[in-house]
Amino acid sequence: MSTAILAPGSRGRRLSKRLLQVVITLFGLLLLTFTIGRVMPIDPVLAIVGPDADQSTYQQVYQQLGFDKSLTTQFGIYFVNLLHGDLGNALLTGKPVVDDIIRVFPATMELATMAIIVGAGLGIPLGVLAAARRNSVSDYVVRIISLAGYSTPIFWVGMMGLLVFYAWLGWVGGAVRVDLGLDGVVPRRTGLITVDALLAGNGQVFWNAINHLILPASLLGFHSLAYISRMTRSFMLAQLSQEFIITARVKGLTERQVIWNHAFRNILVQLLTVVALAYGALLEGAVLIETVFSWPGFGSYLTGSLLLGDMNAVMGCVLLVGVIFVMLNLLSDMLYQFFDPRTKS
């Protein structure tokens, strides 16, 4: 067994190469993020001391932050601090950036998780339907939905969603995670309000959080629905043109069996990759939705940091998004190699 793992072309060797690529990619991302943070036309020293500070105060803070050193030296210091889990302090809160990210990220994760459930739960069946009924009314409707999801600005969708479903109809909660009277009622354990409410056995907070989560998650999931349905349709059309599908139909299998038991089963591995990457994109795309819904998550934190010129926080956020994308990509590759029998040969 060990010989097979070490053999050229084996899954073990491919995984080792992939891990090496991940390390190189993350280092390149770190270097790029640091460089952009230093060349952007934003003065973090001025953001700290304020516009009314005198030159001596400005120069003192400038030296304390290490900006008087070369870029190479600054990057070395930043890299060493990063290895120790230190991303610096945030101007917005005065706390370590790592602590801030740990505090705000669960809110975004909860939103993105619900959004991917909506996007994949609707996008996959719609994509299968469109492929099974190619060039029919159903196919055209699904393609129009997909196009609308790609082209409609998410900020506008969020504003219209709040106006219609909250202000006019009153079907969902407003632009917060829970009602103000229920905020802080359950102890924070995971940062995910729905999970914390379940752990505390508080059904009122749980359903209130769901009521506030439905609208932003559905609107955010609409964009992933467009991508997932389009990719599912493409994968299914490729499978339905294969000879084994024709053979299955000749043998008398029902169309339902052909679609779900043969064609759809063969695209599951590809869909894993699509859904994983869509989930990573949702974590990034949550910035605008969180702004509209006053959602105290990662996106709102990043927006506030950008407006303040807080480069420590911005670089930490950008680095985290990059790490998430790289790790999700690696995970999808590992799942692909594990489940796809063609990678075993």
Task: Give each language-model segment a name.
Residues 9-15, 26, 105-138, 154, ...:
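Alpha-helical transmembrane segments of integral membrane proteins
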Residues 129-152, 157, 164-168:
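Short loop segments and helix-boundary regions at transmembrane helix junctions
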Residues 11, 19, 61, 71-87, ...:
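Hydrophobic alpha-helical segments of integral membrane proteins
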Residues 1-11, 46, 68-124:
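An internal, D/E-rich "acidic patch" concept
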Residues 22, 104, 108, 144-151, ...:
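Residue-level signal for discrete positions within transmembrane alpha-helices
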Residues 26-76, 165-205:
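Hydrophobic alpha-helical transmembrane segments of membrane transport/permease proteins
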